[in-house]
Design a protein with these regions (language model features):
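Low-complexity, intrinsically disordered short peptide segments enriched in small/polar/basic residues
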Residues: 10-11, 184
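C-terminal motif of bacterial Sec signal peptides marking the signal peptidase cleavage site
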Residues: 18-21
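Compositionally biased intrinsically disordered regions enriched in Thr/Gly
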Residues: 23-275
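Bacterial N-terminal signal peptides that target proteins for export
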Residues: 1-9
């Protein structure tokens, strides 16, 4: 009996060691699974963009004190969101649109652009006492949004000197994840640029045929589209040219690509996120 006791304890110790050894892989598996879950959660959290929670509001700017009988009229309506980068991007594009009304192209803030616009109006009024101050009304909206892609539309109504501007629209596309503006060349597959050019030029030639003899003399033979305003909706992408943009007297031109054409032209990962 005394001989059996040491043997019993010997086998008991071996059994406990075996159980402990069996436990280690399970513990490692659990730790590995937890690490994977934490990594996945971290990646998902990093890719989740702030909810926009869009609110219409008056833009943040100030006009100088006016002692004249006829004072400048500036009204900038904007969109405010939970995404601070997007808010700054919207203000930057509004500043660019305002500058385009007075044929300027500088790196200005919204307030600086308004100051430049006011200065131009003052110069006009100083030329002749009966000259009226400028009027500028900007309406801003998010026209389309798909995942990280946002389409901004800025509409302009203005009265400058003897020129009245009504419903002039500008389009801008942003990638919120990369925090950058996107041109049409940024999203098109490089090997599809020639194919897209053929589509655009074909639409352009059809448009030219419908224009007056005067406009036909003014417009270029080919349309340059690399830096054109572009947009996306529920069906596809397109490019936009404002009235008087192609030539002095040319009307507006919008070229729409079909869903199939858009799928063919766009980079696959962008198409998947945009449509």
């Amino acid at each position: 009996m005394n001989t059996l006791k040491p043997l019993f304890f010997f086998f008991l110790m071996i059994g406990m060691m075996a159980l402990t050894a069996c436990d280690h892989p399970k513990k490692n598996e659990t730790d590995s699974a937890q690490a994977t879950e934490q990594h996945t959660a971290a990646v998902e959290k990093a890719e989740v963009l702030p909810y926009l929670n869009m609110q219409e509001a008056k833009a943040d700017y100030a006009l100088p004190f006016c002692e004249k009988k006829n004072c400048i009229d500036v009204d900038i309506q904007t969109i405010k969101t939970q995404d601070e980068w997007l808010n700054a991007w919207i203000a930057k594009n509004q500043a660019n649109v305002i500058q385009q009304q007075i044929e300027q192209n500088k790196n200005l803030t919204l307030q600086q652009a308004i100051n430049a616009y006011v200065k131009k109006s003052d110069e006009w009024q100083d030329k002749y006492s009966k000259n009226k101050a400028y009027e500028l009304h900007l309406n801003t909206r998010i026209a389309s949004q798909r995942n990280q892609y946002v389409l901004l539309q800025v509409g302009v109504n203005a009265q400058q000197e003897d020129i009245a501007v009504k419903d002039r629209f500008y389009f801008f596309v942003a990638d919120r994840k990369l925090q950058k503006s996107l041109s049409v060349l940024d999203v098109i597959q490089k090997n599809q640029q020639n194919a897209l050019n053929d589509i655009i030029q074909a639409h352009y030639q059809q448009w030219i045929e419908k224009q007056s003899p005067e406009v036909k003399k003014q417009v270029p033979k080919k349309l340059y589209w690399g830096q054109a305003d572009w947009f996306f909706d529920g069906e596809g992408i397109g490019v936009h040219y404002r009235a008087n943009e192609i030539s002095k007297d040319a009307p507006q031109l919008d070229i729409y690509l079909s869903t199939e054409q858009s799928k063919q032209m766009l980079q696959p990962d962008i198409y998947q996120q945009m449509f």
